[in-house]
């Protein structure tokens, strides 16, 4: 999908890999080596300590009063989760990457994401995500990057699977 002129960019639906790694020195290097050996290129990556996700769950439990587990269980999970990181990967060949990582005994999950290539100038991401708000589509998380002198930036956005078709149609109407 080519975005309208003022949004200056394109969007495509891709597949993201999520991998749980032990949070220890050298583990990310091992993951990268596994992918390199299969000639799989990492295009974008986000790393988050799993403890943050568990903290969010615990905080939501406190706010809503909905108790899925006992407080002691959450504290135990929180303690254990600091030993792990959640790695989100955009790669050039996701199906092959998934097989390769599973073969190397990694826990892997796949899910659809939206990848935006935008002109690297102030306000471009804001113009695009404004369309999500107008379409009443919540963005769960974003990661991306560009260097100051790069012509393009890349951003990975995750939305609920139920919202993918709606936002694709909304953006397609803009081209």
Identify the meaning behind each predicted range.
Residues 3, 7-175:
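A conserved regulatory-domain signal marking ACT and ACT-like small-molecule sensing domains
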